[in-house]
């Protein structure tokens, strides 16, 4: 499994992403369920050492505004549909700082390294041939929207557990 460092959004933005997830599930796509939380993944590793949580928490964090923009498609055989997060100076700086804390951990994929990372919120995974058009028809008409990054959390995919690192305690 994977472990990650993620950004969590304000309640209004979460509700908008959840609405889009529900629309995609209604047409039979693999969108996250209500038990999942919309987030922006900053860093991923096969293991993030527990001792690094304190170092992550020492990194300066203040809530900041972002904009969720257009749709992107990652992959070809089983595409992933995502909503782009428009890069901003605070977002890029935070990703660079937090990545530096975990960069020695094992199993870090290249696509989360600074200057390669594409900020996004996942809408649907494992799309089969023919489903991409339906997915786009369902959510492409949604306009860009503003959000606030309220906090940083850690996710442990092995234990299916999350905990706050900084910012909001609302998990």
Where are these regions (language model features)?
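Basic, often amphipathic N-terminal segments
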Residues: 1-67, 89-148, 164-171
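Glycine-rich beta-strand-turn "strand-cap" elements at beta-sheet edges
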Residues: 74-77, 150-164
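Charge-rich, low-complexity N-terminal segments
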Residues: 78-81, 85, 115
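A short, structured active-site edge motif that brings together acidic residues
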Residues: 68-74
């Amino acid at each position: 499994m994977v472990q990650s460092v993620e950004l969590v959004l304000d309640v209004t933005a979460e509700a908008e992403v959840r609405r889009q997830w529900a629309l995609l599930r209604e047409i039979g796509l693999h969108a996250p369920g209500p038990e999942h939380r919309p987030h922006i993944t900053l860093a991923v590793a096969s293991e993030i050492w527990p001792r690094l949580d304190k170092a992550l928490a020492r990194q300066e964090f203040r809530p900041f505004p972002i904009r969720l923009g257009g749709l992107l498609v990652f992959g070809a055989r089983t595409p992933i549909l995502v909503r782009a997060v428009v890069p901003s100076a605070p977002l890029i700086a935070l990703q660079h700082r937090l990545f530096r804390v975990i960069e020695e951990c094992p199993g870090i994929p290249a696509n989360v390294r600074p200057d390669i990372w594409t900020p996004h919120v996942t809408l649907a995974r494992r799309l089969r041939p023919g489903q991409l058009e339906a997915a786009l028809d369902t959510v492409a008409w949604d306009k860009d929207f503003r959000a606030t990054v309220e906090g940083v959390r850690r996710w442990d995919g092995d234990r299916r557990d999350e905990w706050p690192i900084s910012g909001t305690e609302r998990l």
